Amino acid sequence: MSRTSDGNTAELWVPTGSATVRVPGKVNLYLAVGDRRDDGYHELTTVFHAVSLVDEVTVRNADLLSLEVVGEGADKLPTDKRNLAWQAAELMAEHVGRAPDVSIFIDKSIPVAGGMAGGSADAAAVLVAMNSLWELNLPRRDLRMLAAQLGSDVPFALHGGTALGTGRGEELATVLSRNTFHWVLAFARSGLSTPAVFTELDRLRDVGSPPRLAEPGPVLAALAAGDPEQLAPLLGNEMQAAAVSLDPALRRALRAGVEAGALAGIVSGSGPTCAFLCRTAESALDVSAQLSGAGVCRTVRIATGPVPGARVVPTPGTPE
């Protein structure tokens, strides 16, 4: 323990060791986008669904803040204050009145700029990891408040499961989701910028009438029933037309997934990852194999949902 010149030790005390958190990516089962507001944002109504494609984030005490990223898309990510995980560390430290002296190590599986909120997931994981590492015992409501300051998708990465999101997506209500749903995720060869997709949606709406969704009640009913065949025709994303406009290859990928046996396919969020809902785990394996050989995407992954939000990974010998 260090001691300051005035004899105060408490504020410098931090436990040693590390904290590792697993955090899921998300698929938007339903995404309705309101018209652009005066502040530049759009009102959203969305059904978030956390899936078993996870990033693993380890935070350790250090002499200064640092960030290292490995895995899926690591070469495309900044490792400084431009990264949302770095901003999360600074925000948490500011919240509790400390310096953000931690090292962050991120092992990524969630695609970068893929519409699955990978950056938001990593930010949520840093909040949870620092809360554990520094033994802060902050309540979940404090973590949710900090998460909402970081971005619209960060609160859901904390929440996990399935949830109805409103506002900019940060206001969440838990949705009952019976059963496990089976997904095949097709990663595109390049990413899409979320602001660019919103801008394209605004442009499409200025010149025409891209499809608008009905209210999400039937989607919630299908989730409560736990029936993938009931859910499949209800999947909808008002941003999909804009994503396909910017990356026309997505149309081929969506068609190929359904032809391979998926019940339905959808662009996740702002894209360009395509998510295919399958009847069973066996069907997901078949669809994955066929999509892998179809030449319409870079990588294919199988996932299930819903899964929990950001959670500390217990170290050996500690209770869950």
UniProtKB/Swiss-Prot annotation:
Catalysed reactions, semicolon-separated: 4-CDP-2-C-methyl-D-erythritol + ATP = 4-CDP-2-C-methyl-D-erythritol 2-phosphate + ADP + H(+)
Gene Ontology BP, a term: terpenoid biosynthetic process
Pathway: Isoprenoid biosynthesis; isopentenyl diphosphate biosynthesis via DXP pathway; isopentenyl diphosphate from 1-deoxy-D-xylulose 5-phosphate: step 3/6
Enzyme category, top tier: transferase
This protein's record includes keyword Protein transport: no
Chain residues that bind ATP: P111, V112, A113, G114, G115, M116, A117, G118, G119, S120, A121
Protein's UniProt keywords contain RNA-binding: no
Keyword list, A-Z: ATP-binding, Isoprene biosynthesis, Kinase, Nucleotide-binding, Transferase
Enzyme Commission (EC) number: 2.7.1.148
Organism superkingdom: Bacteria
Active site positions: K26, D153
HAMAP family xref list: IspE
Record family assignment: Belongs to the GHMP kinase family. IspE subfamily.
Protein name as catalogued: 4-diphosphocytidyl-2-C-methyl-D-erythritol kinase
Organism for this UniProt entry: Mycobacterium ulcerans (strain Agy99)
Gene: ispE
